[in-house]
């Protein structure tokens, strides 16, 4: 269980990818025999949202997240289908990770609610409209969890080990 409360250049994904690679290399496990639950919560929540949401709601500006290519506030999710140089390890991108057997990406609904409400006025919509758009804008294959903290706790209750990845 990889707890990602900060963007941290996408290292939450890279920690999970490193763990899975180590499990297959060191223990000769096959893909899917080890699992990783990555939780994007708090200010890392936008890593679980589409480029359209990033652009419309100016998430880079709102949360001081710089685009690795332009060095300006990001208007895109640089861990989803990244360009060369966007991440230290583009093999650990969210689109590749969520497609791997045994990998689940959870996106904190509590943070989605709070952050969408904060961003609504700047996008010219009501908080209710923003929330619906953000809920619909979760990256394909990821899932909304009631809250990131709840997901972290419940995962541990069910035997997952904890890794701070933010």
Could you say what each language-model-derived stretch is?
Residues 1-166:
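Secreted/extracellular ectodomain signature
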């Amino acid at each position: 269980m990889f707890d990602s409360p900060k963007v941290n250049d996408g290292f939450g994904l890279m920690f999970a990818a490193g763990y899975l690679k180590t499990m297959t290399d060191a223990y000769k496990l096959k893909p899917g025999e080890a699992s990783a639950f990555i939780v994007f919560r708090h200010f890392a929540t936008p890593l679980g949202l589409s480029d359209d949401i990033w652009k419309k709601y100016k998430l880079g500006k709102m949360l001081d997240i710089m685009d690795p290519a332009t060095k300006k506030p990001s208007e895109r999710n640089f861990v989803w289908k990244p360009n060369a140089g966007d991440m230290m390890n583009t093999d650990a991108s969210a689109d590749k990770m969520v497609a791997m057997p045994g990998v689940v990406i959870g996106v904190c609904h509590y943070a989605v609610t709070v952050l969408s409400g904060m961003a609504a006025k700047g996008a010219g919509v009501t908080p209710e409209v923003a929330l619906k758009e953000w809920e619909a804008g979760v990256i394909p294959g990821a899932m909304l969890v009631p809250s990131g903290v709840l997901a972290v706790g419940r995962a541990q209750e069910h035997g997952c080990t904890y890794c701070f990845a933010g």
